[in-house]
Amino acid sequence: MNKAPLLLLLFCLLGCQKDKQRPEQKIFDRILFVYHLKESVEANTWTTFDDPQYDVPLIYFTDSSSYVANPTEKFLKTFKSELVLEDGTIKIYKTQKRVDDSPFHMETGMTLGDPTPEFNYHSPFMMCSSFEETVKTIPDVGSTDEWTTMIIHEYFHGFQYKHKPYMDYYENEIVQVQPDSLTTFYKKLPWFKQSIDAENQLLLDAIAEKDSIQTKRLIQAFWDKRKQRRWQFQQKHKFSLDKFEKCYETMEGTARYVEFSLYKDFANRKPDESLLKSDSSFKSFAKFKNYNLQKDKWLYLTDKTTYFYATGFNMARLLDKLGIEYKSRLFKDGKISLEDILREKY
């Protein structure tokens, strides 16, 4: 008997079996990589980010299925699920049916208001579409590497919401006015936009300024400009937007700050061995080599993004430059904001 054809057939069968396993292995490796990134963020950028008390479950959506990492008991009672991987403290389940029919997810979601039987009532869940589904909605996302930075941004919102004082403040005082309202003011009111763009430039100038006296003058000019805009808005519209702007600026600015921290981390990070084997969309952080913030204007310019993302991001960077501690205070006291902490010192 000729053994060569049999060996070739066996090799092909093993290869086919590996191909069948690969899609699910890729999912597991991606989820595990995200959890390892949380550890990196805690070590390098935001202490307590990976603390178990602030963890939120992750729901990963393909086009036809859902996987959930570390779900709550309520989730498992709501959705029939099978444990498909256990790795240390991480348990990944596959739901029998897709959790919902939405074609795209990249958000931390929860249900607020009157009590409901919903699985995520007062219980935030990070929900993300797979890389393959994400690029259908956001074509500019070029790799699994970039996709994971978006997930960590949203995961940080879960971290914020897991602080009960912050959750209570957000639900009782803020959620009634959604971020889209502030965005509309920026887009529809030229004077409002002009002032915000100028405020943001003052923050950028203060970050870049080396002279401490001039830095203080720039910060005071920022306060004067902001105070005038808010007063003018209240006079014209009979509505104070101060607390909403401060809250969303802190919420989104710090999430962007954490996302940005990964760009710097990826510049020197070694490729993940598991993803190299299972995920052809993993590009070994190639985009982030020799990373330069100035090229990503959408991170820090108000006219390139939702404005309070940029002002919040820049305010966090200014606090870093000034050596003012803020990370241990935010979210533990529900209403305290980046602006409040900067005002205490300047």
Locate each region found by the language model:
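Active-site-proximal alpha-helical
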Residues: 241-268, 282-344
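N-terminal mature-domain "stem" immediately C-terminal to a signal peptide or N-terminal signal-anchor/transmembrane
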Residues: 19-97, 255
